[in-house]
Amino acid sequence: MSATDRFERVPSLPSSTRDRQSLVLTLLAGSIALTLLTPMLWVVLQASQVPLDRILEILLRQETLDIVLNTVVLVTAVTIGSVLVGVPLAMLTVQTDLPFRRFWTVLAAMPLVIPSYIGAFAFISATGQGGAFTDILAPIGIEQIPEIDGLVGSVIVLTLFTYPYVYLTTRASLLSLDGRAIEAARSLNHSRLSAFRRVTLPQLVPGIAAGALLVALYTLSDFGTPALMQYDVFTRMIYVEYDAWRLDYASIFSLLLVGMAIVILAAESRIERTDEGEAYVNRGTDRPGTISLGRWKGPALAFCSTVALLALIVPPAILLYWLGRSTGGIGGSYEFQWIYAWNSVYVSSLAAGVSVLAALPLAYLSARGESRWASLPERSSYVGYAVPGVVLGLGLLYFTLHYVDSLYYTVDILVFAYVVRFMPQAVGTLRSSVLQTDRKLVEAARTLGHSSLSAFRKVVLPLVMPGVIAGAALVFLTSMKEMAATLLLRYPGFETLATYIWLVRSSADYGDAALPALVLIGVSGLSMLVLLWRGYDVQE
Amino acid sequence: MTDHDSDFDGGASGGRETSSRRRFLAASGVTAVGAVAGCLGGPGGNGDGSSGDGEMNEFSLGSFQGSGPFVGSRPEPSGTSIRDLPNLSGTFGVALGGGEGGLYIDLFEELEEIYPDLTIEHRTAPSTDLANTIKQEADADNVQQDIFLSVDAGSLGVVSEAGATQQLSADAISSVPSAFKDDERNWVGVAGRARAVPYNTNELSASDVPSTVQEFPDTLGGSMGWAPSYGAFQSFITAMRLIHDDETAIQWLEDMQNAGVETYADEFQVSQAVADGNLNAGFANHYYALRVKAWNDDPPIELAFTEGDAGALVNVSGAAVLTGADDTAAATDFVRHLLSAEAQEFFATRTYAYPMIPGVQPVGDLPTVDELDAPDIDLTELSDRGGTLDVMREAGLSV
């Protein structure tokens, strides 16, 4: 590997202590990973009830093949789209003299606060005949906006609301980029483009891949957007079978979905491994110089504004348009209460806290472990992220009722569900942070007589703090939006913003659903701002 | 965000026979004064709900009817009034399936207004979710809630099959025709919905609509719309499979497609397209046409019903007492309240559903449930929706 490996074994430590510590870490990470996989027990049990010939028949029929293809197309397109939006935004906000850079830095991350199902709803109700856009734009002579739906609609919406994953991870990589290498390349007569391609890009690839992984897995497991856009993918198939009381079939499709997730995970691992493995290590503070945009300033600003307009202005504007309008629903007056907002914030915060704590051992082992299996607990934690909420919810229900029934009808089971579903996001950010910390610093602390725990606390923790905060923020935001598992697992009287939106949405009265949707966006947005301003990499 | 669960849909159970139209003492809502009849409930344990004791406030029928467009000229409902039922008190845990826009929650709030000592703790989720939850709870012998109120009768069948229900007393559900309750009394229908053929009155007259589903491909098929991904449509196909067989259903689906039927996302859209003149007719649940009427100014849409076949299927939302209820009698009294004249009036005027007791009329100029010629099938068997998915796929429909 690299030069730092030579410092790996600290002579002053007896190897038995090292072994014991690494054994403890491995056991800890392993048991966390197993806990996260417990809901899958039910899925496997259900699937195992289907005879093999029936499984083959289901897997090989034309409809299944079509849906696999549809899903692959959607995941690929959204992932590429997110990279095309997220990477330029990251570069513009980190490396250039873009006007109002700090403003755009925060804004570019904000679409994460908008649930993609709300985004999809906004675009559907805004476009096409009789859409809100047509109403709004009619006075200025625009008669019709084509309807956005199907594959195109799904790709646009999912890209707009998931690209921040790529933006955030790419940004983190850019911030730790070694500027001296670029200068060296430039001094060797490489053009700026060529220097980017040969020096910058290879260093960015693992960061981009980490974000793209989250985008791909999110797209794989999302039900709301393709369902609203009427584009047939795996998750819809799972719901159709689930709704027809064929849990066994739904489980088979869920396992197939997990299979696809494993392929994506393996692909991402390969991308990361082909890299030198040292790109993340922050050796110094020599950041590359700022690139002057010159005449590209206008187009750059136009690009940033367009993304912000589509992702951040359109959905709230549409919601405001519906607010207070009656749209032919059948009524029902289940009133909004602010306690729902508090409930959402409360469980999501707990989920964020627990996720970060549980993610740390996995991330640390994966980043620092010497065995080739060290990444296994970290990789396996992504399984929960790829499974649709309702399947995961039922799996969790089964496990809880049979093995830890004291959890049932408590807030804890919701926290558990969110941790299983969303912790991988924290694992990802933490892992890159751990990789970025220079091992030599830990070794130095150890040689100065600090115990490994103390060295971790005094040296590693402060350095990984940005990763901790970013991970917590991502888990918090996705937990705020979670609907399917929450509907299954909450106890009577406990409503979150998302379940309340479901409740009023079923009356088909958009006016009623607009208020809680706006509150959800508002509360998530405020939390995001606090997080971004407090610690995460805004002050570079 | 599941869209398939947003409305009445799905189905199962109960054998359809001719209903005997029993008349109960006419409790003209506003004037009758509550007399506690047949106090069956004992005190509930563990903070469970109880009946028979507790206070009762005065109320008006109007608060149950709401102010919908079809309320104006309704006859007084007859049947057992809430005033004649044991008072409810304590806490009832209700698993409430489906959304219906919090409408059923409105009914709970009405009841809580009437009984100051009553608290209804509801857990609301898609019916399928709740049925699966209750089934798992029953497997672990840990059923939490007292009552399951589902917009999908198939869910009730699943729950009673899992052994999670307690038998209702014959007396409590005697006002409901036997077609709309379980033979073993594990659940009872509280509101019905009929399959119907909405048609555009500018294009067609009632006599143009065939009286059997099988005639549609050769007659109106080319100018019709349907929503095959919608649960109620799938129950309709399931009924066709039960009455005939899989092959007949496949053939019919293929013939309709060859005739040029148009596909919509849901049955409200089908009904709206009929009213807008984009379709001559469609397949939809009856209440969608009423919603279209309620929100448009005299749209050219009316309903026709086929006779004695799948096209005239009447499916129900229903209630069951769960094994989680310690006081079965009190929980049963809760179900009696759902079958009271006032609650039935609520279902009829607020959700446009078919009332389940003969003393309450459906809204608008709908035929009564007895006048509909519903097919003679066991509603529990409608839960075989999986087989219907296979049939629809076989016929080349994407479901």
Where are these regions (language model features)?
Chain A
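Peri-membrane helix termini and adjoining interfacial loops of integral membrane proteins
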Residues: S2-E8, V44-L56, G128-I140, M229-T235, ...
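Membrane-water interface segments at the C-terminal ends of transmembrane alpha-helices
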Residues: R18-Q49, Q62-L174, Q203-F223, I252-E268, ...
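Short amphipathic alpha-helical coupling elements at transmembrane boundaries
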Residues: D53, E57-L60, T105, A138, ...
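Juxtamembrane helix-boundary/capping and inter-helix hinge elements in multi-pass membrane proteins
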Residues: T96-F100, L175-R180, N189-L193, D243-L247, ...
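Glycine/proline-centered hinge or cleavage motifs at structural transition points of membrane proteins
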Residues: L188-N189, P202, L448-G449, P462
